Amino acid sequence: MTAAGGAAPWEHPGPRGPEAPPRVVVIGGGLAGITAAIALAESGAHVALLEARPRLGGATCSFTRDGLVVDTGQHIYLGCCTAYRGLLGKLGMTAHAPLQPRFDVTVLAPGRQARLRRTALPGPLHMLPALARYPFLSLAERAVVSRPALAMRGLDPADPALDTQRFGDWLAAHGQSTHARRALWDLFSVSALNIAGDDASLALAATVVKTGLLGRSNAADIGVPALPLGELHGDAAATLLAKLGAQVHLGAKVGAIEVNDPAAGPGTSPRPRFLVHLARPAGPAGPAGDVDASSADPATATAPEVGYPAAQLPADAVVLAVPHEAAARLVPPTTLPVGTVNSWSALGASPIVNVHVIYDRPVTDLPFAAAIDSPVQWVFDRTAISGLALNQPAGSRQQYLAISLSAADDYVDVPAAKLRERFVPALADLFPAARDAQVAEFFVTRERRATFRQAPGSNALRPKAGTRLPGLVLAGAWTDTGWPDTMEGAVRSGLAAAIELRRTDPGSEWNASTSTMGVRQ
């Protein structure tokens, strides 16, 4: 692994002979780019992975704060996330992100709590006993809670008509009161779609509900990382890519993609189809204590500079695995149908905010919980994963809780001090032991553009992996994966990009098959 600015020059295989493996540059080191790079390297390509930040992982990353390992955002996955689980297996990390034996979520409200736990019944019957006893719904609401579940089974998430409807309107039409939508349906849709349930695309919500809640009985079982995300994804990916012979260049921001005429080269060595030109990386992170996770490096004050500002990498193929705004700037305008690039900007963005609270004593024994009738949405115990349990002074029993706030438009610009005034009392309402505890530390991380805005009409704006230019493909959870903007969607997009390259460049010296990481495409 090479950090740009180090002593090693940019390396590439040189001119490509008629039977040489293809040279592929993957731009972007998030989950989509990591997945594409692994799949292509396993297929025999010479792969160079470029990442503007000083580490891999994209939005799923970690940084260190006063000896504490902090994830910029809390991420979980479900049993139905087969592509992501396949990636964990490739990285050797399955044991470090274990799935629950059975879906089991504690739901908190001030002064009350409930438990949603699936039974051993086959899907979709496995959740019915828990819903029938769910105390946060009235008897009348529980009597009709199965209506949308039954109706949802007949929906096709790929139907364009569903993408024109709001999930909240559809639930209301199927007998779900405003209270029922907040107390039950929003628990899952808001965190999965990063938008208020009432405002979400029905097509994307249907994917979540049908696949996660109405599919196999174990489809909604929750997996929670037991390692910091930087170790789970970025470090493990760097190790695997090195073993596969791929090059990883960090601090390498791409400024432009130049398209060549491959036939214009002299002699028997055709020119590369693309030249990837490098620029300087993004600027510094936000102030300590209030980290903007959208910045280039939330762990340090300044990102490293690129050592070769005029560098360029030749490539026979390019995987563009960056956020949709960056992709629109980098894609050569002649490669896509008129208006396609401009339509990406209409995808917009939704923020996620994480509120981090360290208490001087334990306040709960729950590993995680959801909440209703509270500004808290989900809360996670990060005492062990952050290293706090091992590194605090002798005799100290501090506990570190992280609140994950999806669809956080109302909070993303609120100062940390104001968020403290709101969320410390909210935690005390949910955890009585917190009322007598002292807050040892409080800080906030913000992902301003965590996902695209998954509102009605958004599915229609998502492009496929392929472009009009053979050899240039798109990846990212914002592309048309059939899934919402999640870790699963990101991994599926990387696989789709790798498969598309093989499909459109059959003459290259690929290995027998491209990895699908156990997923049917």
Where on the chain are the PLM-derived regions?
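N-terminal Rossmann-like FAD-binding beta1-loop-alpha1 element of flavoenzymes
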Residues: 22-49
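N-terminal glycine-rich dinucleotide-binding loop that anchors FAD/FMN and/or NAD(P) in oxidoreductases
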Residues: 62-87
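Short beta-strand to alpha-helix junction loop
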Residues: 75-82, 159-163, 174, 216-240, ...
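Mid-domain catalytic core of redox enzymes
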Residues: 2-8, 19-20, 103, 252-430, ...
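FAD-binding beta-loop-beta segment adjacent to the flavin cofactor pocket
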Residues: 386-395, 447-474, 478-481
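Glycine-rich FAD pyrophosphate-binding loop
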Residues: 41-65
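A conserved FAD-binding loop/helix module that cradles the flavin
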Residues: 479-501, 505
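Mobile amphipathic helical/loop "lid" adjacent to a hydrophobic cofactor/ligand pocket
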Residues: 70, 84-85, 89-90, 94-207, ...
